Amino acid sequence: MKKIVSLMSALVISVVSFAGISNAADSKKPIVIPTHNWSSQIVMAHVIGGIFESMGNNVKYVNTDSQAVYESIRLGDVSLSHEVWESAFGKSFTTALDKGGLVDWGDHEARTLEDMGYPNWVAEKGLCPGLPDWTALKNPACAKNFTTPDSGGKGRMLEGPQTWHGDLIPQRVDALGLGDLWTVKFAGSADALWAELVAAEKEGRGTIIFNWTPNFTDGAGFTFIDFPPYTAGCRPEDGGDGKCGSPDGYLKKAVNADFPKTHPAAAATFKKMSFSTSHIGAMAALVDVDKMTHEDAAKKWLADNKSVWTPFTK
């Protein structure tokens, strides 16, 4: 009988302890949310921050490097990441994950693609017949339609900031034998990519830029080039020859390992958060098309989409 009573007491203590943890109030310390250098990520940071604030949490935003942020999360300097793009940041994410201190917090509904492509009017004007097949880029007549003053007589591809992918695209161009006809330049920011789309159309020349989906361009007419398919290990950094495009990838969330303990309610809400391609594209469009500030875009998105985000808090 004593053993039964002792066992029942232990069970009661366990249940009470678990309930105490699950119902614990979030810490008053701010939830530190990172911002990077593309619109959807910054707007979503403020969307998520707004949701946390509606729950009574304090929020702090910090501008961080998009590769180094996972180490910052692991060490506890940043609380979470809400846009972990597989192609660009998967390696940095996995490295931090393997060290411990960072936790995979699930995927968004949206799937991602990050690669080089062109606005649809490039094909409509016949500037490079054969696209989106990458072999169309082997034609000198195609390349000459994409020259710019800084391209040395070659067709120019405009990559994103070099901090995003390093030399991935230049390595691919050389590996595919396109280096004699094409050169890769790096944009200073995402805004520079969108400015290039406007400038190229105004000047009547072709343009190939780095882009991604989900993004505001999903509804504006943009096509990704069909490079040879991605396979595990095909990139130079993994020992491959570099003759491959980008993978169809995840869009993950990540948190510091202590976040579910310090902010259990916010962590549970963040776990439930899952945005679709259309949600994320709309966030970006409010800034890149409608020219709103990131903060105002987030406020508008939250006001217009209560039915989307309110269930995350339940």
From Swiss-Prot:
Show the GO cellular component annotation of the record.
ATP-binding cassette (ABC) transporter complex; periplasmic space
Q: Where in the cell is it found?
A: Periplasm
The UniProt annotation places trimethylamine N-oxide binding at 38, 85, 114, 164, 212
Q: What is this protein called?
A: Trimethylamine N-oxide-binding protein
Matches recorded under Gene3D superfamilies = Dipeptide-binding Protein, Domain 3, Glycine betaine-binding periplasmic protein, domain 2, Periplasmic binding protein-like II
- Describe the task this protein carries out: Part of the ABC transporter complex TmoXWV involved in trimethylamine N-oxide (TMAO) import. Possesses a high binding affinity toward TMAO, but presents little binding affinity toward betaine, carnitine, trimethylamine (TMA) or dimethylamine (DMA).
Taxonomy, superkingdom = Bacteria
Quaternary arrangement and interactors, per the entry? The complex is probably composed of two ATP-binding proteins (TmoW), two transmembrane proteins (TmoV) and a solute-binding protein (TmoX).
What CDD domains does its record include?
Answer: PBP2_BCP_2
Q: Which GO terms describe its molecular function?
A: transmembrane transporter activity
Q: Which organism is it from?
A: Pelagibacter ubique (strain HTCC1062)
